[in-house]
Swiss-Prot record:
One of its GO terms (cellular component) is extracellular region. It comes from Conus leopardus. The keyword Lyase does not apply. Belongs to the conotoxin T superfamily. Disulfide bonds: none annotated. One of its GO terms (molecular function) is toxin activity. The cysteine framework is V (CC-CC). Residues 23-50 form a propeptide. Keywords: Cleavage on pair of basic residues, Disulfide bond, Secreted, Signal, Toxin. InterPro entries: T-conotoxin. This is Conotoxin Lp5.1.
């Protein structure tokens, strides 16, 4: 039971994470979500261009080359 107060004091001494970014964003900073959105959009566009049948997925692999 002697450890509980020490543990609580240690928790209070640990600094909490800042709620605001410490570094300013530059024009090169892009959120990771936009990369995922761009990848999904590109894959969807390529899938529509290939006009593959979903039953035969291998036909899509041959059209990529």
């Amino acid at each position: 039971m002697r450890c509980v107060p020490v543990f609580i004091i240690l928790l209070l001494l640990i600094p909490s994470a800042p709620s605001v970014d410490a570094q300013r964003k530059t024009k090169d900073d892009v959120p990771l979500a936009s990369f995922h959105d761009n990848a999904k959009r590109t894959l969807k566009r390529l899938w529509n261009k290939r006009s593959c049948c979903p039953q035969e997925f291998l036909c899509c692999l041959y059209l990529v080359k």
